[in-house]
Amino acid sequence: PILRYPGLRETATCTLAELPHLARDLPPRSRVLLAGMVEEVVRKPTKSGGMMARFVLSDETGALEAVAFGRAYDQVSPRLKEDTPVLVLAEVEREEGGVRVLAQAVCTYEELEQVPRALEVEVEASLLDDRGVAHLKSLLDEHAGTLPLYVRVQGAFGEALLALREVRVGEEALGALEAAGFRAYLLPDREVLLQG
């Protein structure tokens, strides 16, 4: 179902099925962005007198349980509605048999429209020889602007997402990149979202 919401899955750090594997390599309490549909919401008081919310987040690869309590509860709880597409800013803790997901903030799909944009371009690793890099750089230089740029490099090794912090492009770079055969799209800026 989340595939019906353009940009939602692409903004996430990983799929839900990939999270346990990714978490093995992350420092404790690392922040990630998770996309999915909200299911099975339960709100209840904590022993300390506050409130907590427990919910299931699901995507095309699987589902996991997340919790929100303390200060995060006030921001998260109103956005937890069954069958709602969301992006969850979460701290991930490794634990026996998997991961614990602590929701810090939730953005509904509609709220993501208000987040500043970034441009992401996908590049096949085999095309990143000197000539390919020069071609990509030339396209980007022609369309300088204010949008942050991310390059998703794909190859036999898997994929890597590179944030090119020194490069800013204009929205018109999207059309130029697509015309040159690159897959490019505008997304909510992950860095803005990860800072909460």
Where are these regions (language model features)?
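Primarily single-stranded nucleic-acid-binding OB-fold modules
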Residues: P1-G196
